[in-house]
């Protein structure tokens, strides 16, 4: 039995996986390619993105997250399972003590929060902790989140953008919006 600590930034456009002592070890698109005839996942992440348009019509690309939350529970679970497997370098992780801390947008509903936790557990994590994205971004940026001073963080993601003020170890206020995201910016540039 061994224990692995993994941090996951589950994003609409990309998913990042961090492993304690190694840093960010996976940075891949949040895409799953599914063989609809066989009803099974064929490719995940960069592999799935690379095969878009190069496969028979029976293989369809799916983005399992929309606007920062789970849109397809089963596909999200499959994607997380593959990313955890890659993080552990293919070793079987059944019986291992994989502990995952995973980010969620601020302001998600209790149902959306529970869906993320359950998808992560179904993917093989034995223990799941949830942190709001602005807090994770502030900690990652080295901001003094525990100090009695306000720190503002702006996190522009693929599906949601968030602004938060953090002080004394908590989020004082936050707003999440869908108006300006990297997906929206890419779409505007292509017009």
Which residues are covered by each model-predicted region?
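Nucleotide/phosphate-binding catalytic cleft detector across ATP-hydrolyzing
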Residues: 1-158, 164-182, 189-190
């Amino acid at each position: 039995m061994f224990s692995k600590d993994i941090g996951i930034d589950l994003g609409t456009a990309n998913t990042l996986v961090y492993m304690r002592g190694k840093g960010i070890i996976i940075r891949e698109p949040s895409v799953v390619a599914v063989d609809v005839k066989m009803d099974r996942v064929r490719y995940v992440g960069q592999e799935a993105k690379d095969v878009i348009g190069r496969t028979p019509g029976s293989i369809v690309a799916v983005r399992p997250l929309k606007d920062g939350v789970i849109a397809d529970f089963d596909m999200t679970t499959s994607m997380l399972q593959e990313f955890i497997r890659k993080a552990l370098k293919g070793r079987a992780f059944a019986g291992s003590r994989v502990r995952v801390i995973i980010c969620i947008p601020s302001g998600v509903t209790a149902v959306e929060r529970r869906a993320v936790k359950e998808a992560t557990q179904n993917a093989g994590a034995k223990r799941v902790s949830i942190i709001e994205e602005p807090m994770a971004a502030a900690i990652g940026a080295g901001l003094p989140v525990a100090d009695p001073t306000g720190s503002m963080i702006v996190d522009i993601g693929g599906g949601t953008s968030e602004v938060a003020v953090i002080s004394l170890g908590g989020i004082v206020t936050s707003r999440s919006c869908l108006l300006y995201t990297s997906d929206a910016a890419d779409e505007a540039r292509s017009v």
